[in-house]
């Protein structure tokens, strides 16, 4: 099972491997709250700044981010982690429901055909 949640939310038994997918380490988060930090899977600085969590740009953000992911070799590492574990949780810090972890989950589910 693949899920997403805020890194600040409480740990749960079904989280499985907890993978932080943000470029920057979130404030106040201790290292033992995250199993793996894949900062290179996050959107480019250019794309992140362009999007700026503007809901009107969400669909275009996803399209551009999916293009970046299709060229990112770290996706293979992430897919291997997900396939190795029964459960995986993509962690993000944003308060916005439209964020890179949600988009990444959508992309991975297409790749995995879930």
What are these regions (language model features)?
Residues 1-114:
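Residues lining hydrophobic/aromatic ligand-binding pockets adjacent to catalytic sites
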């Amino acid at each position: 099972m693949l899920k997403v949640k805020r890194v600040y939310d409480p740990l749960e038994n079904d989280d499985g491997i907890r993978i932080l997918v943000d470029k920057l380490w979130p404030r106040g988060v201790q290292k033992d709250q995250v199993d793996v930090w894949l900062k290179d899977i996050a959107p480019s600085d250019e794309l992140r700044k362009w999007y700026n969590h503007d809901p009107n740009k969400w669909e275009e953000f996803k399209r551009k981010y999916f293009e970046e992911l299709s060229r990112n070799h770290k996706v293979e590492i992430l897919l291997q982690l997900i396939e190795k574990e029964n459960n995986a949780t993509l962690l993000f810090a944003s308060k916005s429901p439209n964020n890179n972890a949600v988009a990444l989950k959508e992309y991975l589910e297409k790749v995995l055909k879930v």
